[in-house]
Amino acid sequence: MVFFSDNIEIYNKRKLVPFGEYTPWYDYLFELAEALNIPLSNLSHGSDDQKDIYFKDIKIIPVICFESTFSNLVNSDNTRELMINISNDSWFGNTLAPHQHLQISQIRAIEFNRFILRATNTGISAVINNNGKVIKYIPNNTEGTITGKIPIIESRSIYSQYGDIGILMLLFFTLITIVISGFYKKHE
């Protein structure tokens, strides 16, 4: 992903698609990978320690394709102001996958209280507001351009501040409740 501002800014994809962009345990599965003849199946991922990306004064959350499925990756720095998701959805063909990929971006918009600009080569390109609503879009397999103004939102969502802590606490208290209720049933 390259942004042009005063300087050229580069972001390298950190989460690669298994068996699509890299082969897990490649050293052990080399023969299988070669037999399957999957193009681009041995790419290298970008570093987790990449410099921030800016467009003018706006701090960008760059997300490439499959990375949008990882909340923790997107939330690695909750000071970012705008999420940009680019994707090659041509892999999916005429399936429901481009719609599901868009829905994942809608969830991220809600989770992080951020607008998302989503640009795809064949999938659904869209502007998604911080409530997960698609404001403008270009349908699947359609060429086009989206223009508009995107507000920068300063406030953070609870999820962007605390991540999975709430879910983990709920799980913990549920387990404690199950253990305690099992203990009392055993001693009745």
Question: What does each of the following model-derived ranges do?
Answer:
Residues 1-162:
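Soluble catalytic domains of enzymes that build or remodel membrane lipids, polysaccharides, and related
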Residues 161-186:
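Selective detector of the "anchor" transmembrane alpha-helix that sits immediately C-terminal
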